[in-house]
Structure formats: C-alpha cells, structure tokens
Regions:
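Structural alpha/beta core scaffold segments of enzyme domains
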Residues: 1-484
Length: 484
C-alpha cells in the first residue's frame, strides 16, 4: 500500500496515491473501511500479532472484524522505542510496544473524530468513535472510518491523545478469534519456507560436521555435471549448490567430494566441559550482576558470613546440557540482488540486523535493501541469529554476477538445523541458602558457570559484570533476602 501520513508531533502533508490513508507505519485505513495494522514484531506462534493489534484497535475504537494484520518489514519507524532496535525476544513485545500502539490508535481516533465534526460542522466533543465509525450523538448521524480516513490524515496529529480507561476496554483482555488462524489452517499463511518467486532457483549448503572447519577442496566439476545444477561455489561457511529444486540441491550437496581442514573444535567433549564448569563453581574469580538490586546491596562476604551462621543450610546444583532450538521450520531465506537494490524474505527475529547484513554483503545503501519478515515456524531465539540470512544473501550476490535479478531460496536440511544450531549454552548452577528455624530465607548465594551468549554475540561487558542471559532471574528483585 502506498501513500500516507506518518504520525508525528506536528502536522504533515498527506501522501495519498491510492486513496488509502497511512496514519503511521503501524496503521492504514482503506476507503472500504479495512483497518490494516502492521505488527512490528515477528510472529512465531506466540500470538504477538493479535496482542499488539488489539491494543491499537482498542484505542482506535475499531471493530475487530474490520481489522487485518500485516507482517512487518525492516523499517526504522518500527524499532523498539526503548532499546532502539527492531527485534523480537525476551518476551518483551507487549511491555515495549504497549504505549506506542495505544498512542497510535488514540491519535488516529481523535483525527477521525475531528474529520467527522468538520464535515458535519459540529464540535468534536459532540462526536465519538465506536466500532469503526464516528457518531454524532445529537443527530444520530454516523460515518465509517473508510469515508473519513483521507480527510483525517491531513489534520494535525494530537500531541497528547486521550487514552481509554481499562474499565472501558472491549478488546484487550477479551477472547477474540485469532487473525492468523484461518490463513494457517487453509495454508495461505506465508512462512519463510513458503516463499515462491518467478524464476526462482534453490540453494543448499554442504558444511563440515565440525564447527569452524573450513573447505580445503571440493569437486566443483562433478557438481556442475549434474543435470539441473546451475552453479557451485564456496561461501564463508561451506559450499553452496544452486539448482532447479531444493531436493536436487540437497542431494548434490550431500554427494559431492569435499575435503575439510582440521577445525579448532575437533576433540571437544561435553564431559570435559561439564567437569570444567563444575570446577569453576569453586574458582576465586566471580562476575557480578551489572544492575542494582532493590533492598540490601549484594555483598559476597556478608552473604557467605550469613550462610555460615544460619541455623539451617541447604545446597542444590542444577545442570543443563547444550540444547538445540529445534524449530519446526528449518532455517531458510529467499533473496534477490539487483544492480541497484536487494530484497530478502526471511523468518527472522532481528530485521534490523538482517538489513544491516544485506547492505554489508551487497555493498548497497541500507535504504536500497528491503527485508520482508514472514511468519516464523518457531523461533525460540535461534532465528535471532542472522547466519542463515547472511548465507542466502551471499549466494544471491554471487548468483547475480551471472544471473542478475534471479531470486534464490536457501533451505537448511533438518540435520543441519540440529548440527549447526546456535545451541543454548550448557550451564551448571549452584545455590546455597541459609534458613531460619521458622523457615525464613536469611541468605542466598548463587553461582552459575557456562559459556556466555553475550561473548558469543560480541557484546562487550565491563570486566567483572556477569552475562545477564546466564544469570537470568536466579538473582532478582521479587523476593527480599537479607543477604544475597
């Protein structure tokens, strides 16, 4: 949909090229009264599309039957207002976007009410919005949102729109049919693996079974000799086979002769890591949580003293192994690279980082790189990583040297999805508690050892500050403990 008005703090010129009013990056209203709400977050089965759309529709006073929900693109207008990033993770979507969606809906509602009042030449205070229409109380007249959207979009945007009282909610907190159920049941929902484009080719990767191993040699001529194989070449993490079907690409990638070098990870054993983590529980070095806790400050020496003096003591150890995310939809993406632009379709949890990667790989300006977020067939944090998108764009870039503008879809096999997962780290956690005779918790000391996600993702933490993903809620503000 083209045309529109971005919600901002001052009036702006409406850009209407097809009579659809774009009130913001989140909201469009068509002349027929269809209310199109773009969810900024990736939908991977958790229901966030309906949740965020309901919040906006509630303030807009929309009839839920008139609402349709659009999948997002990588758009700076949709970034997380607190972290200033466009991502879906940590169960934070409603917390982060609730106020934004409320303001978007409330501002558009007041603009629609004002447009109706102007048409009827009455005061806006005499009108109210209800079920996708604006009504004039005294005369009983009403106009649907579709008839008012275009004139409303040229009005000044309210600085502080009135928000509804939760007591007046009709949608939020109420059970309504999920908008994504019919397309999923009928097979019309487009997941990353479903993307089909005219003239599309299909790619597979051959990778070493050992992490960080590189290609020494491979039989490219044998791969190209297979009927239906279009190209074969090395990429950063293996060999790409481009063919006329995914199945053919998979088979050729599996069958070609490849020699890998020796990887740094060869010889790695889970039991050795487990012993190292157990040993680290008693090491002298200790990183602390990097945020202040309410209540008594964290004091290691005082906590250990309180433990030793407590009438009763308890200790427990938990261990978890490396764990694959095992999303139902294997990793996949589709990309097409032109001389002046690139376009990608991906089931990703991090649209902004993917868009940055597209620009870096193709050398194109970021504004010439488009990323469409599809439905995700599960994510669980694995599709937070961008490796599969980077691989796809790299293949599309190489393909464009000979076949510019040819789309290509990369699909990992199920085996690769498990073997080359970005595994949830193995960890060992030990907690020691001091308890009073009447069962009150007097002291709590916890230590966690294991690989750091922050270090893996190259997020620099100050020396001595613990990775919050490792500690999680092990130490939290929810319970008051005198010494911890």
């Amino acid at each position: 949909v083209s045309g529109g008005l971005l919600l901002r703090s001052a009036p702006a010129a409406a850009l209407m090229t097809d009579s659809t009013a774009r009130f913001s990056a989140y909201l469009e209203i068509t002349p027929t009264g269809r209310i199109r709400i773009t969810s900024p977050q990736s939908e991977m089965g958790q229901g966030i599309h309906d949740a965020l759309a309901k919040i906006l529709a509630e303030e807009l006073e929309a009839d839920w039957a008139d609402v349709e929900i659009a999948l997002p693109t990588a758009d700076d207008a949709l970034i997380n207002p607190i972290t200033r990033r466009h991502r879906t993770a940590a169960s934070e979507s409603v917390v982060i976007y609730r106020d934004v969606m409320r303001r978007m809906g409330a501002s558009a509602r007041e603009m629609l009410v004002q447009a109706a009042a102007d048409r009827w030449q009455v005061a806006a205070s005499e009108c109210h919005a209800e079920r996708s229409a604006v009504r004039h109380r005294a005369s009983g007249r009403q106009l649907g949102f579709g008839a008012l959207a275009v004139p409303a979009a040229v009005l000044p945007v309210p600085q502080n729109p009135a928000l509804k009282s939760p007591a007046d909610y009709r949608l939020v907190g109420r059970t309504t049919p999920r908008k994504d159920t019919p397309p999923k049941v009928t097979g019309q929902a487009v997941y990353g693996i479903d993307v089909q484009l005219p003239g599309m080719l299909y790619a597979a990767l051959r990778r070493s079974p050992v992490v960080a191993s590189r290609i020494k040699t491979f039989d490219r001529e044998a791969a190209l000799a297979r009927s239906g194989v279009v190209d074969a070449f090395e990429v950063d993490e293996g060999i790409a086979i481009v063919a006329s079907s995914t199945w053919l690409a998979w088979q050729v990638a599996k069958e070609i002769s490849v020699e890998f070098d020796e990887a740094p990870a060869e010889g790695f054993e889970s039991e050795a890591l487990r012993k190292a983590m157990r040993t680290a529980l008693d090491a002298d070095n200790e990183a602390r949580l990097g945020r202040a806790l309410s209540g008594p400050a964290y004091d290691r020496d005082a906590t250990l003293a309180a433990l030793s003096s407590a009438p009763r003591q308890a200790e427990w150890i938990y261990e978890v192994p490396f764990l694959a995310h095992a999303a139902l939809e294997p990793l996949c993406a589709t990309a097409v690279v032109h001389a002046d632009r690139a376009e990608v379709w991906a089931p990703t949890q991090q649209p902004d980082r993917c868009r940055d990667a597209i620009a870096a790989i193709t050398g194109l300006p970021r504004e010439r790189c488009t990323l469409h977020v599809t439905f995700l067939g599960g994510g669980f944090g694995r599709k937070w990583e961008t490796d599969f998108v980077r691989q796809t764009v790299t293949i599309a870039r190489e393909l464009a040297r000979k076949r510019p503008g040819t789309p290509v879809k990369l699909t990992w096999t199920r085996e690769q999805d498990f073997l080359h997962d970005r595994f949830r780290p193995a960890h060992v956690a030990r907690s020691r508690a001091g308890v009073s005779d009447d069962g009150r918790l007097l002291a709590l000391h916890s230590r966690v050892t294991g690989p750091s996600i922050f270090t893996f993702q190259k997020r620099n933490l100050p020396p001595g500050v613990a990775d919050p993903f490792a500690t999680g809620l092990l130490i939290n503000d929810f319970y008051r403990v005198p010494a911890r």
